[in-house]
Structure formats: structure tokens, C-alpha cells
Amino acid sequence: KKVPARELTGLLAKERLETGRIYTMFVDHANEHGSWLDQVDTSNLCLEVNHPLIPINDVNDKDAEIGVCILAALNWLEIKDDEEMESVCDIIVRMLDALIEHQDYFVPAAENFAKKRRSLGVGVSNLAALLAKEGLKYWDTKAPNFVSRWMEKTSYYLIKASVEMAK
């Protein structure tokens, strides 16, 4: 059966709006711009972490890989300055990396993925409160640039911490 692309996109958007269940991932974009050497086939539900997969043939398959989410959130409202953001980002990266080594995994394929790939997902919380503290609303024209600057700093310090740990 063929479905017109616009109709399908409309149905997906409607379902997402009404249920919150559909997350759209652009696999081609992820493969073109991601850091993986292996092809990315999927992501976790919320799309923080892209996952190359090696399919499971059995629940005890020691050669397979399935993605797991190693996640944390940075509370932007509590960050006082760039020095504190750098410190908190460093702590988050080291904490999540330590978690990879110390947690119990439900199947060997999950442990394989986590320990081989070491994917970390770091989100943010309290964006609305930070905007309010700065006298901004989501729809203010200055809000996107403000959020972009904060996200760039967050990303920079997380990557810096990861690079330092890799050394």
C-alpha cells in the first residue's frame, strides 16, 4: 500500500501531539553527522542517544549489542557561572561513566553496548525557571539566542570533560 508522504507525516504529527508516543528519528542525518563508524539504526525513545545495533539471537547472546540509556540532567537554574557549569559537567560525565562499570545489566547485550560504546545522554532541567529568572518567556525573541548560548556552553563543557577523561 502506498501512502502519500504528506498524509503520513500528518498522521505521525497528529499521533505524536495526541499521545506523546511517536518520536521521529532521521537515521540518514544521524549517520551523516554522527560520530559512529557503525551504521546507526535506532535511538532510545527520547532520542538522546543514537544506537548502532548487533542483533540478539538469544537472551544470553554475548556477541550482541542493544542500546541502553545512561542519562542525567543538568539543572540550569542552579548553575551560577561558567566555572560552576564546567565543574558540574565534569562531575556528570565522570559519574555516568562510573555508572557504566558498576551497574547491573539485564542482558549481556546491554552490557556489551554500554561498555563498548560508552554513550552518555545529558539533558537539562529548569529551563522555564531560568528563563523566568532572566525575565524571558519561551516566545520572547531573545529566548532562542539565550537558550542556544547556554546549550553551546553545556555541550562544550560536557565534550571537554569527556575528552579529558579519555586522555
Residue spans of the language-model regions?
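Short amphipathic alpha-helical segments with coiled-coil-like heptad repeat character
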Residues: 1-2, 135-139
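Polar, glycine-rich mid-to-C-terminal structural blocks
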Residues: 1-19, 27
